[in-house]
Amino acid sequence: DNNIVTNGKFSGMSIDSVLSEHPEFLGTECEKGRFPLLIKFIDSKESLSIQVHPDDDAARILGEECGKTEMWYLMQSDADAKLYSGLKKQITPDEYKAMVEDGSICDALAQYSVKEDDVFFLPAGRIHAIGAGCFLTEIQQTSDVTYRIYDFKRKDNDGSYRELHTEEAAEAIDYTVFDDYRTQYTPCKNQAVEIADCSYFTTSVYDIDSPTNIEAVKKDTFVVLII
């Protein structure tokens, strides 16, 4: 409701109003009345909490509307910036709960030193956390469901620890271990390079140094350009 069109024939209207009148603008694959993506720019001055999002099936079992799959694209980072993505060793749900309890859960997570242009795809169920010193674009399925696993024992202004969702997260986590969670890709001058493709979004990166045409109008859904 707070996003207002600034030019063209819809100038002055909210995005919600425009989409209510013209749901076809979102294409044929979107649920009517629901903008399908959240796109955030996150500038982390300190480490954010370790968390996980359930997939659609797990979310419904847990009483949520839908799950959340997302991705990160690093825009900038400090020299010592790090993040967590996925498990680096096999653990069971009971071991996970014990590691949350004793504060050692980070020992089970794959930690990455990151730099500009790094990409991480985060399917629902993958444990993750953004460390301090990261400025990134987060593209995600529209959903508010987040299960906080660990918050480094920080307290709020009232001296209370933030709520953790240990049991819900145990049900949502994908305990599969992979060798590498960073997306490997090679930029190509003035051409699209696909860096993520899932049921909820497809993301490509362009490395542009000359005029380039992007055929957005030929697609069967909307296109968001981040420059």
Positions of predicted regions on the chain:
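A short hydrophobic beta-strand segment most commonly corresponding to one strand
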Residues: 70-72, 129-153
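Intrinsically disordered, low-complexity linker/loop segments enriched in Gly/Pro
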Residues: 76-116, 121
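A generic beta-sheet turn/junction motif
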Residues: 43-45, 78, 132, 199, ...
